[in-house]
Amino acid sequence: MPADKSEFSDGAPEVIRSRLALALDVDDIVTARRIAHALQPWFGVAKVGLELFSAAGPEAVEAMIGDGFEVFADLKLLDIPTTVNKAARVMGSLGVSYLTVHTRAGVDHLRAGVEGVADGASAAGLPAPTCLGITVLTSEQADLVALEQRVGFVLDAGCGGLVCSASDLSTVRAIAPNVVTVVPGIRPAGVGVDDQARPSTPTSAIASGADVLVIGRAVTRAEDPISAAISIAAEVASALG
């Protein structure tokens, strides 16, 4: 039975908020904080990507944590292992909850990120973040062989989770049933797909085993962002049963 949207008019319970990541794909911290504040009753995780981090740096992470969000630092680190390790260490010391590292460079590269972010958090007296391996971007078409190989890299490197499209979840869960799965490209039915080649509805993603849904333009560029957030929270609640 569909959840009653009116139950979520003032916000969503933590069990739903913790599974919804708000993509703050803007280039200034003032705008990011304004958007985040307005939608915080429904979203418990703030995604700080390359655009916002390039504009505001560590301040973006610190501001979102200070405002009460978990931070998903979506930086897709891809460099030599030493550099990845050092960058991840910095992000861990800032208190991020999630950090993305690209799987393309292989196990050593991923392991450097896993160890770096954990060491940075430990040195700062903070809980260990979840290092997420980026598999195949949702703006790309999937290659099954590459996907399976990259999921294997995630497991071998000790990553706590990965980022994949909803359409890849069945493959991912068969190989790595216990990792945290983060799914971007979420679009409620009837909303444009923008540049996402493999979008999914919240219902479909949850049913396929997604743990965290990343939602950006479907809410931030909606005619009524609050109404869009309420609808998504209600849809997730229905999917969770």
Residue ranges and their predicted role:
Residues 1-35, 122-128, 170-176, 200, ...:
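N-terminal amphipathic alpha-helix/helix-capping segment at the start of soluble metabolic enzymes
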Residues 27-38, 82-90, 143-153, 196-204:
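Short, acidic/polar
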Residues 110-119, 219-241:
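C-terminal helical cap(s) of enzyme catalytic domains, especially alpha/beta-barrels
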